[in-house]
Amino acid sequence: MKTIVPNWNVPPHIQAFTTTREGGVSLPPFESFNLGDHVEDDKSAVKTNRTLLVEKFNLPHFPLFLTQTHSTRVITLPYEGNDLEADAVYTNQPNQVCLVMTADCLPVLFTNKQGTEVAAAHAGWRGLCDGVLEETVKCFQSAPEEIIAWFGPAIGPNAFQVGKEVIEQFMAFDPIAETAFRPDPNEVGKYLGNLYQIATQRLNKLGITQIYGGEHCTFTEKESFFSY
């Protein structure tokens, strides 16, 4: 089972990783380590993969799987409620697992320097635009300069194609977002966007400057990652 471990400078007791599509039991086109039950994969295969996740990485308990809707809602763990529609998870308690699922969307992991607060956010372009990262950071008691972030694999700046309306939505929040887009040389009227750059801009505006990751492209590395 292949994973990617963040290249960030955090306390050793903070365990973080992102899985790839290798090492599970799902059949094509979901081969093989698909953890999402919202796609048309066999439910028993997804259940097996989730069990493998817990066993392989010695997780302290079965993690909470969110119903992700490109929202800005953050759930704080431990959570006893039934409403799982959210796109980020935060905790300041030990032995909690913050988990989000992504394909082309951007996964962002957070911790403070002391390793007493952690979070994970699912940032598709809609959630990123609407403020899911900002809402996640609001949960932290630590000051922004004490927070460290890592960008997991997402669709890269040479593959994320959008229309002018998407750029305008980002610019409505902050005009600097325009610098994260460039005309697509292969299609008139379309643009290529850099989710990593936009997320960096958003976090920098909050005062978070210790940011790692952002070197993968799920669209071009389809052997390793799921992509639409």
Where are these regions (language model features)?
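Active-site microenvironment for binding and transforming phosphate-containing groups
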Residues: 1-228
